[in-house]
From Swiss-Prot:
This is Endoribonuclease YbeY. InterPro entries: MetalPrtase_cat_dom_sf_prd, YbeY, YbeY_CS. Residues 1-10 have a biased composition (Polar residues). SUPFAM superfamilies: Metalloproteases ('zincins'), catalytic domain. Its EC number is 3.1.-.-. Single strand-specific metallo-endoribonuclease involved in late-stage 70S ribosome quality control and in maturation of the 3' terminus of the 16S rRNA. It is found in: Cytoplasm. Keywords: Cytoplasm, Endonuclease, Hydrolase, Metal-binding, Nuclease, Ribosome biogenesis, rRNA processing, Zinc. It comes from Nitrosospira multiformis (strain ATCC 25196 / NCIMB 11849 / C 71).
Length: 189
């Protein structure tokens, strides 16, 4: 088996030299009372690093449906809980409610990723997906949004989907879009 020298999130420079791995400062918060298993901090970190192409400071929060609904309503004007939300902070602007608080370091990417446990669990069941595989997919999806990926246009959606699929395969997970379109598999806007 070929040794993996870097994550698939790392841009390919075309050179043989091993790319320098992205530095990550990450805070994880569990704010849900779900009875289903939640990904460990180590798994979340592994998934984030696999998708990361730049040094980053990220707060990842797993929430209940009430908080997920409130955040989606307040920040996106969508009156329902969604599976993943990504908040990117530029030019040192951090939302006052961010788990990062005022402790922003010298990282070029700073942001929050919020996963709504009940929505993730429900989707995994409806789509007959392994729960941890679905958490991995949505974590990677959020990290790609943090780095500027989006899926508003068809070509952008295709690029994001291919990148997610490649990263998840590298992590040992199946194609999350097999049998689905992006809008069906990931409902983040």
């Amino acid at each position: 088996m070929k040794e993996r020298s870097s994550s698939p999130g790392t841009p390919d420079s075309g050179r043989r030299a091993r790319p320098k791995p992205a530095k990550l400062k990450m805070t994880v918060q569990y704010a849900t009372s779900t009875r289903e298993p939640l990904p460990s901090r180590a798994l979340l970190r592994k998934w984030v690093k696999a998708a990361l192409a730049h040094d980053a400071e990220i707060a990842l929060r797993i929430v209940d449906e009430e908080e997920g609904h409130r955040l989606n309503r307040d920040f996106r004007n969508k009156d329902y809980a969604t599976n993943v939300l990504t908040f990117v902070y530029r030019d040192g602007q951090i939302h006052p409610d961010s788990p990062l608080g005022e402790k922003r370091g010298a990282y070029p990417l700073t942001g929050d990723i919020v996963l709504c446990a009940p929505v993730v669990e429900n989707e995994a069941g409806q789509q007959q997906k392994d729960l941890m595989a679905h958490y991995a997919h949505l974590t990677v999806h959020g990290v790609l949004h943090l780095q500027g990926y989006d899926h508003q246009e068809d070509e952008d959606a295709k690029n994001m989907e291919e990148t997610e699929t490649r990263i998840l395969a590298w992590l040992g997970y199946e194609d999350p879009y097999a049998g689905y379109q992006l809008a069906e598999a990931v409902d983040c806007g």
